[in-house]
Amino acid sequence: MPRIETEVRLDFKDVLIRPKRSTLKSRSQVDVQREFRFLNSKRTWSGVPVIAANMDTVGTFEMAVELAKLEFITCVHKHYTPQDWATFAAKHPDVLPTVAVSGGSSAADVEKITAILKSHPDIRFICLDVANGYSEVFVQAVRNVRSAFPEHTIIAGNVVTGEMVEELLLSGADIIKVGIGPGSVCTTRKQTGVGYPQLSAVLECADAAHGLNGHVISDGGCTCPGDVAKAFGAGADFVMLGGMLAGHDESGGDKIEINGKLLKKFYGMSSSEAMKKHNGGVAEYRASEGKSVTVPYRGPVSGTCKEILGGVRSTCTYVGASKLKEISKRTTFIRVSQQLNEVFGRAPNEQEEQVSKKQKTG
C-alpha cells in the first residue's frame, strides 16, 4: 500500500545559515583544503573538495588542466576515447592524479575504464555514474570494479537515502554521489516524479556515510557560492558542480552569438541532445530526462572558481570556522520563507559582467 512520509524535506532555498561568534579577522585565514583517507582504496587525498561534473560541457580535459591548478578534482566525461586519453596524458601527465575516469555500469563502459586505467596508472579516481544508483545491477558493477581495482578510489552514484549509501560503501565504493533531480538541466523529477530535496538528502546521506568512515559528494542543486557553503555545512565532503562551471572557455563547445551576446550550450547527459549525439537518438522505451540550454559566456573558469571559494571562505568567517573541515560542526540551519531582497532583480554574476564589458570595449 502506498504511504506518505509527513516530515518535510528541505532544499538549499529553504534555509539560511545562522551566524555565530567568530575570532577570525579575515577570510584569508580560512583553510579550504581538506585531507581524506578513503574507506576501501585506503588512499589519502588532499586538496580543495570541489569537483567538476562528468558532463560533456563541464568535465573536459581543458577543465581538468585549469582546475588542477586550484587542486580541484575533475570527473572527466565518459565520451573521450582511449586515444584521446593517451594524447591528454602525454601533454599533461601532472594532471592525471586530479581526474576521475567516468563510466556507467555496462560491460562496454567497464571495459573502456579498464583499458584507460591500465594505460595510465597515475589516474587514481574512478567515477561510476548512473541515473538510478538503486539498481542491483549497479551495485554488482561497483563490486566488480572494486575487485578489479582494489587500490583506486571509487566514486559511485547517484542515490539520496542512507540505506543505499551504506550498501554502496559496503560493496566497495569510497565516495557516494548524492542527488536525484536537483541539477539545473535535469528533468528527472518532472518526467518521473522521483527525487529528494538536496539539503535533506545530503544531511541524511552524510550521516550514514560517516558512520562507516565513508564520504559523500553533494551533486547538483548549487546555483551560487552560498549553496556550495550550505552543502558543506550539511556534511558533504565534496561538492560537485555542473551549471556553475558551464559557459567558460574550458567548458567545451563553440561560442554562439545571439543579439550581440556570447553564449555557450549546456545540456544534461540524459537530454535528447546528449542521446542524439552519443547514442543516435532517444530509445523508444525511454524519455529524455534532461534539457539543453544556452548560458552566458563567462570567460576563464578560474574567475568563477575564485568567486566560489571566496563565498565559502566568507561563510566560514560568519560561523567561526577557521578550516573548511569545521564548517559542518559550526553550522545551524534556520528555515526561512524568503532568502533574498530582489527589488532590483538578480545580482549580476561578476564574471559575466567582466566578459560583457570586454565585448563592448572590444
Swiss-Prot record:
SMART domains, sorted: IMPDH
SUPFAM superfamilies: Inosine monophosphate dehydrogenase (IMPDH) (SSF51412)
Binding site for GMP: 219-221, 242-243, 268-270, 286-290
Pfam families for the chain: IMPDH (PF00478)
Name under which the protein is recorded: GMP reductase
Enzyme Commission number(s) from the entry: 1.7.1.7
Family: Belongs to the IMPDH/GMPR family.
Protein biosynthesis in keyword set: no
Keywords: Metal-binding, NADP, Oxidoreductase, Potassium, Purine metabolism
Function: Catalyzes the irreversible NADPH-dependent deamination of GMP to IMP. It functions in the conversion of nucleobase, nucleoside and nucleotide derivatives of G to A nucleotides, and in maintaining the intracellular balance of A and G nucleotides.
Molecular function via GO: GMP reductase activity; metal ion binding
Organism, as annotated: Phytophthora infestans
InterPro entries: Aldolase_TIM (IPR013785), GMP_reductase (IPR050139), GMPR (IPR005993), IMP_DH/GMP_Rdtase_CS (IPR015875), IMP_DH_GMPRt (IPR001093)
Chain sites annotated for binding NADP(+): 26-27, 78, 129-131, 180-181, 269, 285-286, 314-317
UniProt-annotated catalytic positions: 186 (thioimidate intermediate), 188 (proton donor/acceptor)
Broad class of enzyme this protein falls into: oxidoreductase
GO process terms (BP): purine nucleobase metabolic process; purine nucleotide metabolic process
GO cellular component: GMP reductase complex
Binding locations of K(+): 181, 183, 186, 189
Catalysed reactions listed for this entry: IMP + NH4(+) + NADP(+) = GMP + NADPH + 2 H(+)
